[in-house]
């Protein structure tokens, strides 16, 4: 997407903390280490402590950067990655994972009104689950698995649950929506973003999920 949007002359902003910075830059750009023309990258240094001790991580600082970039009016498309649910989910600490997701909720409540104010829309999604399932499930009973001492067995791996794709839109008057399908995946995201930006999709991309009413 970064290259396609750059060729279209769009200014882009990418931000995350160290733990996920590569996901919005290097991986996003097809394992390319350098920027495309028109890209601005901002890395927020992560705390060097166990994640369960700082479950809020750098969500607030990422949000500060995103709000400043939105208000600057310089960028046509912006992207960020909140690492909380994944990194804290890996610890198996249920209380910390709950706090990590709540921290992201708080920051979305800051970002979304600014998106409204600048006349934008947002897509919110993930590439896998983690904090959504913090205990191992007993395959025979379907209940949470327990250790010998009666405590629940922590799940520290990614889950296989489907993830949502949410279109946040308060500017189109209800004209924008997403097609409902069980076959969609991450491969549809690029065309959906291009569609929102008024661009043609790359020929290699899967179809857009945008439904314009």
Give, region by region, the residue ranges found by the protein language model.
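Feature captures the catalytic ectodomains and active-site-proximal regions of enzymes
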Residues: 1-213
